UniProtKB/Swiss-Prot annotation:
The gene is cuf1. Pfam families: Copper-fist. This is Metal-binding regulatory protein cuf1. GO terms for cellular component: cytoplasm; nucleus. GO terms for biological process: copper ion homeostasis; intracellular copper ion homeostasis; intracellular iron ion homeostasis; negative regulation of transcription by RNA polymerase II; positive regulation of transcription by RNA polymerase II. Residues 63-92 are annotated as: Disordered. Residues 69-92 have a biased composition (Low complexity). Copper-sensing transcription factor that regulates iron uptake genes. Under copper starvation conditions activates the transcription of the copper transport genes, ctr4, ctr5 and ctr6. Coiled coil: none annotated.
Length: 411
């Protein structure tokens, strides 16, 4: 096989015997090797229009004759494959030279509106017909001309939120469909402290503002329960009681309640225990404090929640996670006490349950003390002193009252 002016040549016997690639005959007449595939049936102008404008029509340049080229005067530089595929006359011997493409200035005998008009509707472009298409055979985006006749691809259908806001991300239901919910999650959804589903759209928390935030908040809502934004506090929900028990054992946070409580973190960093799921619709929580429920808005006002707990009043918080001006660097498995980024970790909930259990015992002891004192006063009609009350009350033992103040025997 001999290459002359970027055209592969071989003798006729080797071409017919399918040995054109190994042909080394120099004493025979050589002929150009036709490329594989179907022959070109369109002129150069129609081929460019087929690619750039998607005009899949038959070439109407029927005035073209064999051995002539139907093209206008242009300076289009075609590669070797396009030159060999053209229908121009090709020299039949080595002695003849191929004319350069820039000097070809032939015209159709009869001008056609689709081929050889005086004012072509498409300007000549320097396009490589083989390398300027993608893997699907479509022209690349950077090579597509900006014209009104170009057919744009349809945009993908966008999802819309519940209140009509456009969202290009998946709905929140599809993100959390395969996530395991806590065992008492249905009880939480029935509680009067949940976020209403029919409040106005201007206070609807939009999950579609960022794909990263939407996925992260969807996962947190599936594990810890949906956050409450209306009344200024966030529900801290953790269904893993084993992790809370392990954290309590590690840090010796005893006593603990029989069932871990659910807490709400206020905007100022305080924590408030919420009613348990067994007393969801009751007038008071497990501590006996009444909670004001607004029936019109179906949420709890944070000003009526009992005894806000501040962890810094009970524990030393050396971790930077508990500081308001620092971000957590521990990741999703953070177990730092009082972490503001992960307030529902097992260590924080174990400490809150420990403080709540102590306050509950103090409240119950105080109530029993006042009840016992009232009964004694009503029966004896006189007020007992502290020493007499300490000696007669079963709540005060040697660990809580100094031994010198305890009297033995009956009063």
């Amino acid at each position: 096989m001999v290459v002359i002016n970027n055209v592969k040549m071989a003798c006729m016997k080797c071409i017919r015997g399918h040995r054109s690639s190994t042909c080394k005959h120099n004493d025979r007449e050589l002929f150009p090797i036709r490329p594989k595939g179907r022959p070109i049936s369109q002129c150069e102008k129609c081929r460019i229009a087929r690619i750039t404008r998607h005009l899949h029509v038959k070439c109407t340049c029927n005035s073209r004759k064999k051995g002539s080229k139907c093209s206008t005067s242009s300076t289009t530089d075609l590669d070797s494959s396009s030159a060999s595929n053209s229908s121009c006359s090709i020299p039949s011997s080595i002695s003849e030279k191929l004319l350069p493409r820039d000097n070809v200035k032939t015209h159709c005998p009869k001008r056609s509106a689709s081929c050889c008009g005086k004012k072509p509707d498409v300007m000549p472009l320097k396009i490589n017909l083989e390398s300027q298409t993608d893997f699907m055979g479509m022209p690349l985006q950077s090579q597509r001309p900006h014209s009104e006749s170009y057919r744009m691809l349809p945009e993908p259908e966008k999802f819309k939120s519940e209140y009509g806001y456009p969202s290009q991300f998946l709905p929140i239901e599809k993100l959390t469909s395969n996530v395991a919910y806590p065992p008492n999650y249905n009880n939480y959804l029935k509680s009067p402290y949940q976020q209403p589903t029919n409040f106005p759209p201007e206070i609807q928390y939009n999950y579609s503002h960022s794909p990263q935030h939407s996925i992260q908040e969807a996962e947190e809502a599936a594990v810890y329960g949906p956050p409450v934004y209306r009344s200024g506090y966030q529900i801290l929900y953790n269904n893993n009681t084993d992790s809370i028990a392990a954290a309590a054992a590690t840090h010796d946070l005893y006593p603990q309640p029989d069932v871990p409580l659910t807490f709400a973190m206020l905007a100022d960093g305080n924590y408030v225990p919420l009613p348990s799921s067994t007393n969801t619709y009751g007038p008071s929580n497990s501590y006996g404090y009444e909670i004001n429920i607004n029936e019109s808005t179906n949420h709890v006002d944070s000003s009526y929640l009992p005894h806000p707990i501040q962890l810094s009043n009970y524990f030393t918080l050396p971790s930077s996670c508990a500081q308001a001006d620092a971000a957590c660097q521990c990741g999703d498995n953070c177990e730092c006490l009082g972490c503001l980024t992960h307030p529902n970790n097992a260590t924080t909930l174990a400490a809150l349950n420990h403080i709540s259990a102590l306050e509950k015992e103090t409240i119950s002891h105080t109530d029993l003390h006042h009840t016992f004192k009232h009964e004694v006063n009503s029966s004896n009609n006189y007020e007992l002193t502290n020493d007499e009350l300490a000696a007669s009350s079963p709540l005060y033992t040697s660990s809580s009252v100094p031994p010198s103040h305890i009297t033995t025997g009956s009063t």
